[in-house]
């Protein structure tokens, strides 16, 4: 990472943002995009940002890179971004050698207390912006409010995807992860051309044997469900995610950035189609909205509480008919619930 890139990264990291309180970040990103030559961008009603650079030739499609603009951390008056060195904690199935020391970025508030630096997903934003600066033909999407259910990307402008050939998100921790299934949605064809071509170049760029994983949810799953485009989510260098002691490996972010260039060099401006097949369940229906109607589902008694269950494309809503309270579970959490309820209620619960 060059010194100029590091300065840009630290400036981005110092911008406070939290789910539903993202105006400062969105305004900052608008100012950055305004200063980029050859880039056109716009903001939709959700405050998602869409940017395009370059003109396509005949039968070409844009590579698209995405990230999200919110973090889980509490807003503080000032985020002081500091440089340091650290070994890496165990992260999603990988333990790192204790003598493997990385240059890191971490954050303190004005009282010198640790505060979340927000690498999830400011690291992803940084990578998207740098790719926008350096690639000749590219699109990026920066989506709001991912952390509480991908609210921004669920309202993505589908016309923006009409000339996109593949989508790459940078929103996984560490430097060794690739998401293949997200919210129960497969992002690319198993053993298909897309993954067989990108996996070697990602591993070469990242310097790691990549682990394919299931991810609870992130924006790329929403785009996959709404399109016929192959998608992927890749590590972008943050550790101790969602804690005040979160930090970012500068080396891993730099490698992730290089992987973006390597992916475009390998795949070019082609389209890699992969159709999403919406799942169906016997004796159970899927609804597009999340509003309950009297005739949607049967009411049954569960542990002395009358509840209703309804499903949308991301998971299920459980509503207490006594208190009116609703909880939402994403698809990854639903399967254990189905099994538990089936065992608990035997034949009285149909799904």
Task: Identify the meaning behind each predicted range.
Residues 211-256:
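Zn-dependent metallopeptidase/amidohydrolase metal-coordination segment
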């Amino acid at each position: 990472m060059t010194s100029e890139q590091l300065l840009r990264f630290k400036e981005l990291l110092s911008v406070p943002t939290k789910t539903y309180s993202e105006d400062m970040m969105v305004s900052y990103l608008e100012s950055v995009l305004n200063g980029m030559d050859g880039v056109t961008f716009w903001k939709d009603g959700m405050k998602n940002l869409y940017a395009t650079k370059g003109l396509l030739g005949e039968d070409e499609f844009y590579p698209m890179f995405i990230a999200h603009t919110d973090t889980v951390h509490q807003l503080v008056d000032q985020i002081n971004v500091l440089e340091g060195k650290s070994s890496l904690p165990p992260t999603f199935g990988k333990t790192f050698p204790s003598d493997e020391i990385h240059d890191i970025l971490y954050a303190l508030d004005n009282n010198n207390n640790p505060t979340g630096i927000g690498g999830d997903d400011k690291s992803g934003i940084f990578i998207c912006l740098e790719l926008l600066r350096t690639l000749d033909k590219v699109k990026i999407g920066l989506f709001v409010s991912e952390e509480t259910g991908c609210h921004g990307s669920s309202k993505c402008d589908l016309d923006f995807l009409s000339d996109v050939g593949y989508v790459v998100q940078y929103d996984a921790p560490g430097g060794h992860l690739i998401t293949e299934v997200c919210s129960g949605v497969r992002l690319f064809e198993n053993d298909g051309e897309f993954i067989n071509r990108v996996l070697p170049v990602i591993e070469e760029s990242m310097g790691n044997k990549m682990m394919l994983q299931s991810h609870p949810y992130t924006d790329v799953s929403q785009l996959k469900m709404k399109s016929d485009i192959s998608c992927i989510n890749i590590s972008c260098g943050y550790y101790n995610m969602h804690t005040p002691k979160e930090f970012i490996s500068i080396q891993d972010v730099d490698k992730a950035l290089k992987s973006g260039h390597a992916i475009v060099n390998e795949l070019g401006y082609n389209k890699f189609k992969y159709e999403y097949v919406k799942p169906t369940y016997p004796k159970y229906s899927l609804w597009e909205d999340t509003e309950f109607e009297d005739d949607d589902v049967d009411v049954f008694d569960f542990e002395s509480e009358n509840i209703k269950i309804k499903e949308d494309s991301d998971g299920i809503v459980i509503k207490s008919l006594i208190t009116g309270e609703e909880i939402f579970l994403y698809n990854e959490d639903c399967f254990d619930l189905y099994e538990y309820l089936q065992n608990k209620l035997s034949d009285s619960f149909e799904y």
